[in-house]
Regions:
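C-terminal helicase lobe and adjacent C-terminal extensions/tails of nucleic-acid helicase motors
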Residues: 2-9, 13, 18-29, 33-49, ...
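Conserved two-lobed SF2 helicase motor
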Residues: 57-73, 85
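Conserved P-loop NTPase nucleotide-binding/switch module
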Residues: 75-77
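Short hinge/gating elements
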Residues: 79-83
Length: 166
């Protein structure tokens, strides 16, 4: 919450509804500070997204801080100068990065990937598989390149230990 409070316009995506609720509660309630998760009914989610989109269109310096679960990662056309994403699979991190400087108006912008305490992260098997797939691809590569995503998913899905086994 402290890091998010340093930014006037920021999006933070976390892995669970509980984390979204707790982080939102710790943010200063100034300007437009929003929580988005499936704890909300669909009508309230739509209303909140509409409020957010309208606020982002306004070029004032109003504070806009949003804490959301993954529901904002795909199919939501929003643009923030700074995005924070709790550690997750590469696909989720890249979806979150797609909400950062989406329109290219801000020059270089930053997406930060962070970890919370162990009890707030993805299930161990899921996180381990995602990390192994990421590490196997190496460093210094273009994570947005289609061939990199293909390689990532091949590595991820060949590791059956992260999936349910009957």
């Amino acid at each position: 919450a402290e890091m998010l409070s340093k930014h006037k316009r920021v999006l933070c995506i976390v892995n669970t509804r509980r984390d979204a609720k707790e982080l939102y509660a710790r943010l200063p309630q100034e300007g437009i500070t929003l929580h988005l998760s499936k704890m909300m009914c669909p009508a309230h989610i739509s209303e909140t997204l509409e409020k957010l989109k309208n606020a982002l269109k306004d070029d004032t310096n109003e504070v806009i801080r949003v804490v959301s679960t993954q529901l904002i990662e795909a199919g939501v056309d929003i643009d923030f100068p700074i995005v924070y994403r709790q550690e997750a699979g590469l696909d989720s991190v890249l979806q979150a990065a797609g909400r950062c400087n989406r329109e290219g108006k801000n020059g270089l912008s930053t997406t930060y990937v962070f970890s919370l305490s162990k009890e707030h992260n993805l299930p161990k098997g899921e996180m381990q598989a995602a990390n192994n797939a990421r590490l196997s691809l190496g460093t210094g590569i273009d994570w947005f390149a289609p061939n990199v995503m293909t390689s990532y998913f091949k590595q991820l899905y060949c590791r059956k230990e992260c999936f349910d086994v009957k």
